Regions:
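A conserved pocket-lining segment of Rossmann-fold NAD(P)-dependent short-chain dehydrogenase/reductase
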Residues: 191-218, 223-226, 238
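N-terminal Rossmann NAD(P)H-binding glycine-rich loop of SDR-like oxidoreductase domains
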Residues: 2-26
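Glycine/proline-rich active-site loop of Rossmann-fold NAD(P)-dependent oxidoreductases
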Residues: 176-190, 227-245
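NAD(P)H-binding glycine-rich loop region in Rossmannoid oxidoreductase-like domains
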Residues: 33-94, 106, 110
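Amphipathic terminal alpha-helices
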Residues: 27, 317-349
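Terminal hydrophobic/aromatic helix or amphipathic segment near a protein terminus
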Residues: 237-238, 245-301
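Conserved Rossmann-fold NAD(P)-dependent oxidoreductase catalytic core, especially the SDR/UDP-sugar
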Residues: 89-150, 167, 177
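Conserved beta-loop-beta element that borders a ligand/cofactor-binding pocket
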Residues: 152-180
Length: 349
């Protein structure tokens, strides 16, 4: 079974690669990496993985490698339209007589469009999207201007399934330490922790009532593994193309509550004098983090039904709340707030 993977040194892709290689060392895997330094990171942990050098704009290379593959996993960028088109072009040109499989990564930021359109930040929402009863809403009902939607539509444009069968995995707020060869850190909660430590207090957008959904990176990787295994079994029990949309979640979070958890953890670990949380306007948050108003202030709620029903997938890793202390400590170390750590990290100790 030949796989071509994009994003192997990223947070999502690195952990997914770890999960797949651990269970299926027999797979013939080729990874796109940007440069020899990135390649060396992969080669140390996965010497059997073949490396090709380029980036997401290396469309001819992506077409060529996709044409050679049975399965392509795009873990690299939910917003790179040219790369998605190149993958589909390559898979469509395969001469094997069987369909090639594309497993693409989107993100539940796509669900923020209502709040973004109405410029509502910090308030709650009752709308919960799902990938079973309302699957067609995710295929045809999301407006074109929603985040990630342009590339979702490219992937969904392959409808007959004769040459290409596609599945979109749509993860929410991802947390937990990755196991990959490159980046092992997520964005939303670590960025909140970093700015909390910088400001000396917790950061809440507006009333702090905003809902998101959460998933541990290890549980997300398990879904990628199950989809790859299904693809390797001629599609298996998975659904593809018009029904190939998979949320991946383990429940809701409320950003105001997360802000308090981060502040309490920072105080408990001695990085802040108190555990106070301050309310910020979207404009104030934007000065700290360009996407902060959306990441911590817009609603994005979903339910992962399809993977559970069809693939037997379930989440089993620790909750986000259980990982807060480790996240805060990691960011504190990066910022040199842990005595001696900055010198060790710089090689001066």
């Amino acid at each position: 079974m030949k796989l071509f993977v994009l994003g192997a040194t990223g947070y999502i892709g690195g952990d997914a690669l770890h999960a797949i290689v651990k269970v299926h060392p027999e797979y013939d895997i080729t990874a796109l990496v940007r440069n020899p330094d990135k390649g060396a990171q992969v080669a140390v942990d996965y010497p059997k993985v073949k490396l090709v050098y380029g980036d997401l704009d290396s469309c001819e290379l992506i077409v060529e490698e996709s044409q050679k593959a049975d399965i392509v996993c795009n873990w690299a960028d939910a917003d790179h339209e040219a790369a998605a088109k190149a993958i589909i072009k390559g898979l469509s040109a395969r001469q094997s007589g069987t369909p090639g499989y594309l497993i693409h990564t989107s993100g539940t930021g796509i669900l923020m469009y209502t709040d973004l359109d109405q410029k509502i930040f910090g308030e709650d929402a009752t709308k919960i999207h799902d990938d079973w009863d309302n699957i067609q809403e995710m295929i045809t009902g999301i407006p074109d201007h929603a985040p990630h939607r342009n590339v979702d539509k490219v992937v969904q444009s392959v409808r007959d399934g004769k040459a290409v069968k596609s599945a979109i995995v749509c993860p929410p707020c991802i947390y937990g330490a990755g196991r990959g060869p490159g980046n092992q850190t997520s964005v939303q909660v670590p960025l909140l922790a970093q700015n909390t430590l910088k400001q000396g207090h917790g950061i809440q957008v507006g009333a702090g009532k905003t809902f998101w959904t959460q998933i541990h990176v290890h549980d997300l990787s398990n879904l990628y593994l199950k989809l790859v295994e299904a693809a390797a079994a001629d599609g298996g029990s998975a659904t593809w193309n018009d029904e190939g949309y998979y949320f991946c979640e383990s429940g809701d979070l409320v950003w105001g509550e997360v802000a308090h958890q981060v502040a309490k953890s920072a105080h408990k670990q001695g990085f802040m004098r108190e555990d106070q949380v301050k309310e910020y306007s979207p404009e104030e948050v934007k000065k700290l983090a360009a996407w902060g108003p959306a990441l911590w202030g817009c609603n994005s709620r979903c339910r992962a039904i399809r993977a559970k029903k069809l693939l037997g997938w379930s989440a089993s890793s620790p909750s986000l709340k259980d990982e807060i202390d480790a996240t805060v400590l990691f960011q504190a170390k990066k910022m040199g707030l842990v005595p001696g750590h900055a010198k060790i990290a710089a090689g001066d100790a």
